[in-house]
Regions:
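Central helical "cap/lid" subdomain
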Residues: 189-246
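Helical element adjacent to the flavin cofactor pocket in flavoenzyme catalytic cores
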Residues: 139-198, 202
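Short beta-strand to alpha-helix junction loop
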Residues: 67-70, 89-99, 139-161, 169, ...
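Beta1/beta-strand and adjacent pyrophosphate-binding region of the FAD-binding site
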Residues: 3-18, 35
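Dinucleotide-binding Rossmann-like beta1-alpha1 core, especially the glycine-rich loop
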Residues: 52-126, 252-257, 261-265, 292
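Glycine-rich Rossmann-fold phosphate-binding loop(s) that bind the pyrophosphate
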Residues: 15-20, 39, 203
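Active-site lid/adjacent beta-loop-alpha segment flanking the redox-cofactor pocket in flavoenzymes
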Residues: 86, 217, 233-337
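Glycine-rich FAD pyrophosphate-binding loop
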Residues: 27-49
Length: 338
C-alpha cells in the first residue's frame, strides 16, 4: 500500500461522483501531483453517490442546466455507464399539461430532440403497469436514462491514476486544516499532514463541516430524500438489466417510480423537510447500512404510498410485492434549491 504523500499540488477531499470527476478532469487538463483522500472505503465510501437513484431527465427551463446535463450525459455514455430507457412526466391537472408543453418548448430551444406530448393511452403503451385513468397525459422524452454512478466514479478515478497524475487513498479522515493568509496550506489527517497548493472540498453532505475547518462556509445542508424498493415484481421477472422500462416522473405529487431490476423504486420529495447537521451523520463503522442511509420513517411516507398506489396499483397493490429496502437517504441541498 502506497504511503500518504506529505506534499501535493492539489488535494481532492472526497471520492464520490463529484470528487472523482474533479480528479479526472484536472488530470485531463494536465495537472499532476494530485492526491485524493476519503474517510470511507472504495468504491463506495458511504456518501450520497452510493444510494442515489441516478436517473437523468435532460430537459430544464434553464439553458445552462440543460447544457450541463447534456454534457454530463455525453461523458457518462463515453464511460459506458449510461442506460437509456426513456421517461414520462405525467400530468394530473390541466395546469400541469400546460407546463409540460412549456417543457417541450424549452427542449426544442436548447436542442434536445425526440420529446413529445402523449395521451393517457400512449402513456399506457409506453408503461403498461401505469393506471392511465388518473392522468391527463404526459411528456415522453426517449433520451432519459440511468447512470451507474459508482462505476462511473471508479472509472474516472482509475483513468486519472493511469495518466500518472493522481494517487487515491481510502479510509483516511481529515481532522483539520492549516490556513495562512486566507488559503489552505495544509490538510491534516489521521495518517499525517499534506501540504498543498490547492485543496478541493468535494464531500457532499460533509462539505460544510470541512469548510469550517478552513474558516469558511459551503452552503450545503444534509437533507433527507425518502425512497423504497418493492418487489419482486412479476412484470419485471424476465428483466436482464437494471432498467428496461421508462421512468415515471410525477411532479404533481413530487414523486417518481422507476424499475430497478426486478423491483420498483418509489421516491418522494413531498415529505416534510427532514434536515441534519453534518456532525449528526454517523461514521462508517457506526452506520447500520452506510453513513448516509438513515432508518426509514414510514409515517412520513404514508401519503406517498397512497399516491404510488393510485398511479401503479397493479404493482403497489399486489400483496405478493413486498418492501425490500427503504431509507431516509441523505442528500446535500443548497438554499437556492440547486
Amino acid at each position: 500500500m502506497a504511503q500518504l504523500p506529505t506534499k501535493a499540488k492539489c488535494v481532492v477531499i472526497g471520492a464520490g461522483i463529484v470528487g472523482n470527476s474533479i480528479l479526472y478532469h484536472l488530470a485531463r487538463l494536465g495537472w499532476k501531483d494530485l492526491v485524493q483522500i476519503d474517510k470511507g472505503p472504495l468504491p463506495n465510501p458511504g456518501g450520497s453517490t452510493g444510494h442515489a437513484s441516478n436517473f437523468i431527465f435532460p430537459v430544464d427551463h434553464s439553458k445552462e442546466m440543460a447544457h450541463i446535463t447534456a454534457d454530463s450525459m455525453r461523458q457518462y455514455k463515453e464511460l459506458g455507464c449510461f442506460t437509456e430507457c426513456g421517461g414520462v412526466e405525467v400530468a394530473h391537472t390541466p395546469e400541469r399539461m400546460i407546463e409540460l408543453t412549456r417543457r417541450i418548448t424549452s427542449a426544442k430551444s436548447w436542442g434536445i430532440d425526440g420529446g413529445r406530448i402523449v395521451t393517457p393511452a400512449e402513456v399506457k403503451e409506453l408503461i403498461p403497469y401505469i393506471e392511465e385513468s388518473v392522468i391527463l397525459g404526459g411528456y415522453y422524452q426517449p433520451t432519459v436514462g440511468v447512470v451507474d454512478s459508482l462505476r462511473a466514479g471508479t472509472l474516472m478515478r482509475e483513468k486519472a491514476i493511469e495518466m500518472g497524475a493522481a494517487q487515491s487513498f481510502a479510509n483516511i479522515e481529515v481532522t483539520g486544516m492549516d490556513v495562512e493568509n486566507g488559503r489552505i496550506k495544509r490538510v491534516k489527517t489521521e495518517q499525517g499532514d499534506i501540504e498543498a497548493e490547492y485543496v478541493v472540498i468535494a464531500t457532499g453532505c460533509w462539505s460544510a463541516k470541512l469548510a469550517k475547518m478552513a474558516g469558511s462556509e459551503i452552503p450545503l445542508t444534509p437533507a433527507v430524500h425518502q425512497m423504497k424498493d418493492i418487489g419482486p415484481v412479476p412484470f419485471f421477472a424476465n428483466t436482464k438489466g437494471d432498467i428496461e422500462w421508462p421512468i415515471i416522473r410525477d411532479m404533481d405529487t413530487n414523486m417518481y417510480e422507476r424499475q430497478h431490476g426486478t423491483g420498483l423504486e418509489v421516491g418522494s420529495y413531498a415529505h416534510r423537510p427532514i434536515l441534519y447537521e453534518a456532525e449528526e451523520i454517523p461514521s462508517n463503522a457506526a452506520a447500520a447500512l452506510s453513513p448516509t442511509e438513515f432508518p426509514f420513517t414510514q409515517k412520513d411516507f404514508d401519503l406517498q404510498d397512497e399516491h404510488s398506489y393510485e398511479l401503479v396499483p397493479s404493482i403497489v397493490g399486489d400483496e405478493n410485492v413486498r418492501e425490500k429496502y427503504a431509507i431516509n437517504g441523505i442528500l446535500s441541498l443548497t438554499p437556492d434549491g440547486m
